[in-house]
Amino acid sequence: MNARKLLVSILMFVSVLISSCAPAATPAPTAVPPTVAPTVVASQGPVPFSSKVYKLHMSVSFGADWHAIDDFTDLVTVAGKQKDWNVGFNIVSNAKVADPVSGAQIPFPADFASWIKSNPDFKADEPTEVTVAGFKGTQIDATPIPTKQKDFLYMSGTKWNIIPSAEQWRFILLNDVNGERLLVLLIAPTDQFNDAVQQSQSILDSVVFTK
């Protein structure tokens, strides 16, 4: 055998032996990313509201879809932000209503249920008994049917109107809430009224009166 080939063969053999005996290379450690805690979004639960000027000591809670738009001594109104829904807490002890015929301002009726049923500007259902915040009251659903916009209820800082539009109203009259007559008024478009009733029930359930 050629000496050069023999030497190359021997060198290759020795190289293979050295390679087989050498320790295997240790792979570089893989970096593990730090664990990130998932972001927790706080739920938007009902928030209590209590007026500083309202004559009754009342607390009412509502969610992010509602907000207070009236804050008077005799009226707090909670309204839907996205929909034309209103829940008004009217202290009517000294309020006046509009006579449906003459339009004159007259004292709030002693027998409101009979008055609203005889009012030609409304088509009213039969009254039912309800309880709000532990106080018994009378509930009447009614549909305004005026031919033009008219005044209805006068409060100290504002008033309620009836309009010739497809609306439905719910009256809840509590005759004695710590010495005051309180008329809770829910107004919503006719096609949204049932939904408004359901979603506003939690507002009514949250009401608390204190002395």
Residue positions per predicted region:
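N-terminal targeting sequences that direct proteins away from the cytosol to non-cytosolic compartments
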Residues: A3-N94, T128, F135, I163-A166, ...
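Functionally engaged cysteine thiol sites
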Residues: C21, K96-P100, K148-D151
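Structured domain cores in non-transmembrane regions
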Residues: S93-P109, P120-F122
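Short amphipathic alpha-helical segments
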Residues: A104-F112, D195-Q199
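Signature of long, low-cysteine stretches enriched in small and polar/charged residues
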Residues: A110-L174
